[in-house]
């Protein structure tokens, strides 16, 4: 495999798709040696097939606001790879959504889902619609309009979307209601549903919970644990909320959250009512974290900056892609942390990842450390299929087992001769080999 030639061809086909090209390059560099040991892969152009989505669906979404004005957004569904199961991946509603971002997310999702050990392919979708400042009625009308096209392309054995940025329980409910009305079928076609209509326990917290289980396993490789460690978290949505809850439960102290407006530093620790308040911030729709300072005296709001300048033992990106760059990595490395994990999808730039690995920092890539969300979505699919609902304890135990298994796969493929575990390489190779073997078995399709 010639990585540079493949990337040159991709860049010519997909100019300007920076996020997608970044994600592909990272994986290709990691798997190059292993790929070259399998000439049968080259014969069937496996890489060339793997890096292109199987299908991209694009559609207009016309809807009417509360004043009667018509708006038109763009809807997408990228069905990236279905070799090991139905396409599975979230829907994102945010003005930044474009094809490059969704292709990168779908590509990453393919390997992340493979790591979970569950039979799920990779996909991603969404729209450039923003829920910010919109009424419940407007959000409902948009979701219904979005589903009037999407329903043709999804199903419990075909493609099972979930939530992502801008798509929480409310939006999933509206989407599911419209799907049911259009198809006259009550199926497990979406995950992240409410408990009253087929959802799974701990799904909202699952990404954060799973991340802390993974970090716990990483620290254990160096004889450490989370207890009494300080933790800097970015974001204040579901991922950050779940991470803060589980970190506190495991004895750690969360000292930061952040938003587009800046970050909160709370030396006393973000626990109890403070964690619950994160949900209020999210549900306000204002996308700011400054009100936390007013609510909890003693905390400090730092305007326009990211929390990476705060000294902590553990750093977790929980907001969005590429939120931690090379300069941020230098700042973090100077603090001599125990662990860094990109709990958000591709939360670190390529430069930042390279710096962490070069410094032999304990570093967890998103496709491994944040797989708890989609793993629990897979468990929701299973519960829907067998018409049963598991207890919180049962789901949490299964999630813990899955994250332990993912960690074992990363160590198997990522441990170097000198003992350092390159989790980026390990996760990429483990996910790739499962998908590649499935594609080989199914022929050139």
Can you annotate each of these PLM segments?
Residues 21, 37-44, 117, 154-163, ...:
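Flexible, glycine/charged-enriched surface loops at secondary-structure junctions
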Residues 262-362, 368:
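Rossmann-like adenosine-cofactor binding region
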Residues 41-71:
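Structured beta-strand/loop patches that form or line metal/cofactor-binding pockets in enzymes
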Residues 191-194, 199-309:
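Glycine-rich phosphate/diphosphate-binding loop of Rossmann-like nucleotide-binding domains
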Residues 94, 113-227:
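Glycine/serine-rich phosphate-binding loop and adjoining beta1-alpha1 elements at the start
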Residues 1, 15, 19-22, 26, ...:
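Conserved active-site and cofactor/substrate-binding residues in soluble primary-metabolism enzymes
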Residues 2-23, 218, 333-445:
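Adenosine-phosphate binding glycine-rich loop
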């Amino acid at each position: 495999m010639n990585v540079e030639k493949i990337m040159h061809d991709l860049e010519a086909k997909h100019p300007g798709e920076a996020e997608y090209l970044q994600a592909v390059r990272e994986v290709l560099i990691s798997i190059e040696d292993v790929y070259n040991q399998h000439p049968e892969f080259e014969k069937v152009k496996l890489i060339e097939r793997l890096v292109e989505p199987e299908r991209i669906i694009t559609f207009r979404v016309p809807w009417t606001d509360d004043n009667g004005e018509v708006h038109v957004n763009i809807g997408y569904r990228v069905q990236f790879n279905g070799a090991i199961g139905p396409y599975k991946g979230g829907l994102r509603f945010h003005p930044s959504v474009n094809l490059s971002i969704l292709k990168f997310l779908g590509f990453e999702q393919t390997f992340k889902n493979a790591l979970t050990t569950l039979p799920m392919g990779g996909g991603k979708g969404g729209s450039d619609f923003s829920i910010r400042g919109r009424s419940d009625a407007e959000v409902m009308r948009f979701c219904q309009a979005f589903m009037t096209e999407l329903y043709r392309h999804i199903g419990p054995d075909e493609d099972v979307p979930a939530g992502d940025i801008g798509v929480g329980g409310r939006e999933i409910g509206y989407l599911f209601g419209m799907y049911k009305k259009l198809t006259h079928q009550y199926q497990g076609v979406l995950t992240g549903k409410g408990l009253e209509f087929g959802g799974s326990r701990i799904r909202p917290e699952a990404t954060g919970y799973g991340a802390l289980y993974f970090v716990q396993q990483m620290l254990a490789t160096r004889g450490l644990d989370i207890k009494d460690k300080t933790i800097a978290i970015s974001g204040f949505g579901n991922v950050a909320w779940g991470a803060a809850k589980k970190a506190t439960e495991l004895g750690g102290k969360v000292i930061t959250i952040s938003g587009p407006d800046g970050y909160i530093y709370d030396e006393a620790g973000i626990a109890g009512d403070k964690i619950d308040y994160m949900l209020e911030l999210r549900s306000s729709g204002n996308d700011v974290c400054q009100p936390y300072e007013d609510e909890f005296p003693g905390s400090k709001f730092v305007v326009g900056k990211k929390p990476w300048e705060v000294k902590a033992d553990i750093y977790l990106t929980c907001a969005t892609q590429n939120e931690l760059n090379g300069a941020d990595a230098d700042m973090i490395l100077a603090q001599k942390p125990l662990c860094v994990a990109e709990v958000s999808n591709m939360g670190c730039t390529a430069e930042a990842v390279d710096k962490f690995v070069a410094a032999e920092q304990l570093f967890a890539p998103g496709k491994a450390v944040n797989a708890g969300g989609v793993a629990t979505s897979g468990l929701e699919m299973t519960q829907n299929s067998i018409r049963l609902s598991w207890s919180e304890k049962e789901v949490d135990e299964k999630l813990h087992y899955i994250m332990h298994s993912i960690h074992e796969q990363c160590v198997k493929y990522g441990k170097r001769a000198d003992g350092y575990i390159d989790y980026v390489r390990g996760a990429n190779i483990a996910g790739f080999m499962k998908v590649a073997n499935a594609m080989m078995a199914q022929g050139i399709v």
